[in-house]
Amino acid sequence: MEKVDILRRADIFYDLSGAQLEMLASICEERIVKLGDIIFEENSQGDEMFVIARGAVEILVDPSIVGGPGAKKRGSLPVTIATLRSGQTFGEIVLVDQGLRTASARCAETETQLLAIPRNKFMKLCDTYPEMGYRVMRNIAAELAFKIRGSDLAIREQLLWRPRPAA
């Protein structure tokens, strides 16, 4: 499948023109990862986001990194919080800031094809074509807001269903 077709399926690029998708495709790097391969680790420095062309990727968090009561009981095994499939994106927050990764990403199928979008090349493209940069950043903001709302809901659910100590 062509890079432009892969990008077109991703929500954050839905409103880009054909020419804008071509420009974006020109900076993408194709990667093939195998089952169990770590794409990036939680708390590592990030410099690229990814679009899943084919396959699946698990997003994991390590409860022991957060600490707090019960962290040792939970152990240090990562917990899968999402499984993403073809057409979905991950790691987009590095296009917004240069902070550390908030989760790990691991290949979840025998073979997964990714498009990597390097932050430095993306930012140069945005500087040259600000309308395109605005559209993508607006869509990334909407995607991140959606993910935050989902996390908020999950936290509320856990708080409501957590057993309370006997009085």
Regions found by a protein language model. Name each.
Residues 1-167:
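Cytosolic regulatory regions built on CNB/CRP/Popeye-like sensor folds
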